[in-house]
Amino acid sequence: MDLLGTTGAVAISLYAALSTAYKGMQAIYALPTNTTAASTPVTGSGAPPSVDVIVPCYNEDPRALSACLASIAKQDYAGELRVYVVDDGSGNRNAIIPVHDHYACDPRFRFILMPKNVGKRKAQIVAIRESSGDLVLNVDSDTTIAPDVVTKLALKMYSPAVGAAMGQLTASNRSDTWLTRLIDMEYWLACNEERAAQARFGAVMCCCGPCAMYRRSALLLLLDKYETQLFRGRPSDFGEDRHLTILMLNAGFRTEYVPEAIAATVVPNSMGAYLRQQLRWARSTFRDTLLALRLLPGLDRYLTLDVIGQNLGPLLLALSVLTGLAQLALTATVPWSTILMIASMTMVRCGVAAFRARELRFLGFSLHTLLNVALLLPLKAYALCTLSNSDWLSRGSPAAAPNGVKDSPEPHC
């Protein structure tokens, strides 16, 4: 066997060994523990903790925003609930003002209109500083939450050791295209395998932004660091959910996952939008992995395997693919061993997912392997080479809000 063949064989063998160990342990730790969530209120008075729901909004579709706010208004939470909708300098403000007006007479709702676009993170922080609830729930403006989400997340926050908790994400537009169906399965796996396994040790590495609850006392301790995140001396304006989660863990708080708290969010329905989203996520993951490495000595050893599996695994897979392509180009021989290894591992993973979810559609997730090899691996390489780029890609250019309004107008009941 020549050098090229040897390199390919070693790379795919190491990838298979690492993936088997990582995914095997992940599958075990992701199994339900049959422990019931605590049902005692967080506050010592016996009353449920007050909850502030923050909804940052930028150029949102009025229908999506209306559905989001309607789902929040229907929460069955027994405690005090307040809602802060922050319009981050939207250019379509005239179109969404009627949505605001619909809730103008609901005393739970307050609308904050930013005079210009400042970014999701700063919009969040404005609402955090304006509000005062015991717990803070972030909900993206294109996300709808089940009626019991606030209740279930607040129960998970019973212990003062818990700094953050996230719900389970699904794709609200799952039926749109083959891509949205694939992303919906991707979300299920990310939540019910990756996050569920991490939560076994109280260390969910990213409490996803569409539906994540935080303890205010913990937030206030970390707010300055969160607001002033820098990367290579420049402000970092995306990946706020992952960075805030890492800050929580670094401060000694637990981060949890609540699969019963269901949130449905709009996912990209075109390949271009999906790849732009994945590029942002890859950059933020690489950036915050450097911070996460410092946490690993204080966490369970599984989390070390998790970080290695998520970062070294794609590198070994990319090396396997590159050597396979080189073998095909230089020797005109098909790298069957690499192809068969990747295919067999894909089918095993999809089979396990289909069994756990009790849904045969997960067998179709094998298509994601082709997408991963053809597009996502090169995209991750590009992300690694452009870590300093903080462009959101999906955002339009900052738009000034009409009339420079800073707060909501008088309600019209």
Curated annotation (Swiss-Prot):
GO molecular function, one term: hyaluronan synthase activity
Keywords tagged on the record: Cell membrane, Glycosyltransferase, Membrane, Nodulation, Plasmid, Transferase
Principal localisation: membrane
Cellular compartment(s): Cell membrane
UniProt xrefs under SUPFAM superfamilies: Nucleotide-diphospho-sugar transferases
Gene Ontology terms describing biological process: extracellular matrix assembly; hyaluronan biosynthetic process
Enzyme nomenclature, EC number: 2.4.1.-
Pfam family, one: Glycos_transf_2
Cellular component, GO, one term: plasma membrane
Membrane topology: Peripheral membrane protein
InterPro entries (UniProt xref): Chitooligosach_Synthase_NodC, Glyco_trans_2-like, Nucleotide-diphossugar_trans
Annotated disulfide bonds: none
Function noted in UniProt: Involved in the synthesis of Nod factor, a sulfated N-acyl-beta-1,4-tetrasaccharide of N-acetylglucosamine which initiates a series of events in the host plant species leading eventually to nodulation.
Family, similarity comment: Belongs to the NodC/HAS family.
The protein's name: N-acetylglucosaminyltransferase
Organism: Sinorhizobium fredii (strain NBRC 101917 / NGR234)
Gene name for this UniProt entry: nodC
